[in-house]
Amino acid sequence: MSFSTLPFLFYFLPAFLAVYYIVPARFRNAVLALGSLLFYWLGAGTGALLVLLALILVNFAAGRLIEDAHGDERRAWLILALACDVGSLFYFKYMGWFLENLGRLTNTDFSFFRVALPLGVSFYVFQSIAYIADVYRGDAEAERSLLDYAAFQAMFPQLVMGPILRLRDVSAELHTKRPFSRAAVESGFSLFVVGLGCKVVLADQLASLWTALERIGFAYLSAPLAWFGAVGYSLQLYYDFAGYSLMAMGLARMLGFVIPRNFDLPYCSRSISEFWRRWHITLGIWFRDYLYIPLGGSRNGKRRLLLSLFVVWTLTGLWHGAAWNFVLWGLVLFVFIALEKFCIGGFLERHRFLSRLYFLFLFPQTWVVFHISDLGELGDYFSRLYPFLSSGESVFAGDLLRQLESYWWLFALGILLATPWPRRFYEKYRATPLVWLPLFAVFWLCLYLIATGTGNPFLYARF
């Protein structure tokens, strides 16, 4: 079940909120846990629910055992819990890809191996690992109530696509009564509507542009249309994922929780490094705290720094998907981030205008690598981005103009909303009709678009 569907908006959410606030406050974590598991079952099915339940039980028990144990026993429980978490992620997400590549090398048929990827597994496994690591380090106390832990681990606003929570992000709210607050519900609903608009009005409508490019064939695009498509996909992905994150923040606020922001105007960045401090913030923090720093980070010389960056960005690519284009994407990011750290960082810092041009030129190209899984088709697309480096001529010379007729307003709106000005306007006037009336209109427009069947699944849900 997706947030941008009529059953969620008109059945699940109103019913859940009614039960959540009608029951006595001491039962709200139980309602949150059970309601979240119901939400997940409705969207992902019984098999995926069993995987989630198993990991909840394993990590709840491991947290208590680690906290109560001493010496090597604590480390043993940590390793066992991490093996369950990482092993589950590898089995469901990477085993098929690993066997496929092994089969090519050994001429062996592994086609018998088929396993469905549980919805959101990459997100909730990383959240489980963070919990276990924090308990082991003494940065968090293990939850003593299974229902409280399940409410934290399975909280439906962020379960499928983040933000990736740490217990300390919500611990205070998790252990308080969270009384009904009209102001919190109104504030949360406004955030939800902004996110819904990003998803339904922008991301879902931009999705048809890429479909049109696939229909034409990447090898037959003109260079202008290829660049137009790369920028269009960059906007689509941003408003799809950032829209979900805003909806998650809004829903959590309606329930009495304040969860971390996952995006901070990433397309206003001046470097690839800065972008990744603004995009999917909780994933970046996770890799920093649980991988980059333990590997040595920047504290042990340039070689260790390069090794740490290489491991982090290769695994960042693989986290997004089991395919070679994701590995390549992670390596491309590693190269540019290493260049910024060792070679061009000072230049970018001194030249604001040139640094923005550098970023805006590079990043749409990295999203092309991210999106096209077939490496041959990826080569075709880049041959259209740089036609002077390849054989053949740009064809369909008027194709950009035909697409501009349909998409110019989405590009204009998407670029405007990616700047700081709309956020400043919202913060200044959010209690006035200047904000509420447009939000009301956006909500009804979204309902119309959803009812007419123009929506698409969330892109990051497949990770």
What are these regions (language model features)?
Residues 1-462:
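Membrane-embedded transmembrane alpha-helical bundles that form the catalytic cores
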